[in-house]
Amino acid sequence: LEVLLGSGDGSLVFVPSEFSVPSGEKIVFKNNAGFPHNVVFDEDEIPAGVDAVKISMPEEELLNAPGETYVVTLDTKGTYSFYCSPHQGAGMVGKVTVN
């Protein structure tokens, strides 16, 4: 599944922002605009026993150019909240449910 970081009109959003995937499916987060973005999973809003650091980009690492990607595979079923740390305050947040 591909998730765009930034909409076509330049909005600071994930597209889609809420989605479901089967356990073990690769999620490809792809920078869609020229803004620096990243993908950080909220340690308080992921399934118990999952290490947020292992599935998140380091907060100082950014996808700067259009087309740059970050790939993650989630195996533990449940709901995961994530955000872009530079743009979290602007509402750039998302949620994935692993079935």
Curated annotation (Swiss-Prot):
Q: Which family does it belong to?
A: Belongs to the plastocyanin family.
Q: Identify the gene encoding this protein.
A: PETE
Q: What Gene3D superfamilies is this protein classified in?
A: Cupredoxins - blue copper proteins (2.60.40.420)
- Subcellular localization(s) per the UniProt record: Plastid, Chloroplast thylakoid membrane
Residues forming the Plastocyanin-like domain are: 1-99
How does the protein associate with the membrane? Peripheral membrane protein
Recorded GO molecular functions are:
copper ion binding; electron transporter, transferring electrons from cytochrome b6/f complex of photosystem II activity
PROSITE patterns xrefs: COPPER_BLUE
Q: Under which name does UniProt file this protein?
A: Plastocyanin
Which cofactors does it use?
Cu(2+)
What is this protein's function?
Participates in electron transfer between P700 and the cytochrome b6-f complex in photosystem I.
What InterPro entries does the annotation carry? BlueCu_1, BlueCu_1_BS, Copper_blue_Plastocyanin, Cupredoxin, Plastocyanin
Keyword annotations of the record: Chloroplast, Copper, Electron transport, Membrane, Metal-binding, Plastid, Thylakoid, Transport
Question: Would I find Chloroplast among this entry's keywords?
Answer: yes
Disulfide cysteine pairs (residue numbers)? none
Q: Where does Cu cation bind?
A: H37, C84, H87, M92
Q: Which NCBIfam families match?
A: cyanin_plasto
Q: Which GO terms describe its cellular component?
A: chloroplast thylakoid lumen; chloroplast thylakoid membrane
According to its UniProt entry, this protein's organism is Phaseolus vulgaris
